[in-house]
């Protein structure tokens, strides 16, 4: 059965969709010593999903550094608490790796923020915003993309919480892991649709919907 996707997904339709939750293991990395084994484990995977979180700023001129780097395989997500560890040699090795595909969204911005912590040469990263256009999707937010491609909602309730808090709560950990892991799912499905053409694109144009085979 061919999948129906939309060039622009109606944000109002997201509310009624079932919520997506990362079903795997979540491992929080708090110390420099833990980063080496975590990175070795991650780089043994064939693909990784990546994202970052930063403590929100509510006052003019207030800026915070990236507090969390989340990196997920298909079943395990590591949450690197950069506000505790900084960018260790192992984390730098992960970020500079050129052998394993790392999938993110709006990742160019994340790289700029990470490089404010420490300079590094970005390795093999693929930004979903650079490839969704290949199947006719114009939306660029993770929530809209996932709703469009999979019919599930990624909750954003935890986005503006304090990511520098001493102990992340379960909702924060689940949110962070889901964001990184979902990038793998999106990349693999976008690539499948692009290669097979197994989809119908519904184009919304000036209030009209035009189905494209």
What kind of feature is each model-predicted range?
Residues 23-30, 34-36, 43-47, 56-156, ...:
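Conserved DEDDh/DEDDy metal-dependent 3′-5′ exonuclease domain
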Residues 1-48, 117, 128, 181, ...:
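N-terminal accessory regions of nucleic-acid-interacting proteins
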């Amino acid at each position: 059965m061919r999948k129906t996707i939309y060039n622009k997904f109606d944000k109002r339709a997201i509310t009624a969709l079932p919520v997506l939750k990362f079903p795997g293991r979540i491992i929080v990395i708090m110390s420099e010593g833990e980063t080496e084994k975590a990175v070795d484990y991650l780089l043994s995977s064939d693909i990784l999903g990546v994202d970052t979180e930063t403590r929100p700023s509510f006052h003019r001129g207030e800026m915070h550094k990236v507090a969390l780097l989340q990196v997920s395989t298909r079943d395990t997500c590591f949450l690197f608490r950069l506000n505790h560890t900084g960018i260790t040699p192992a984390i730098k090795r992960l970020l500079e790796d050129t052998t394993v595909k790392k999938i993110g969204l709006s990742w160019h911005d994340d790289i700029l923020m990470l490089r404010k912590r420490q300079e590094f040469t970005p390795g093999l990263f693929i930004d979903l915003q650079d490839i969704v256009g290949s199947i006719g999707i114009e939306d660029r937010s993770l929530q809209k993309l996932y709703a469009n491609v999979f019919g599930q909602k990624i909750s954003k309730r935890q986005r503006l919480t304090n990511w520098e808090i001493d102990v992340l709560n379960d909702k924060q950990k689940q949110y962070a892991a889901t964001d990184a892991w979902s990038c793998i799912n999106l990349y693999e499905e976008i690539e499948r649709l692009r290669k097979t053409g197994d989809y119908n694109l519904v184009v919304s144009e000036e209030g009209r919907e035009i189905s494209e085979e």
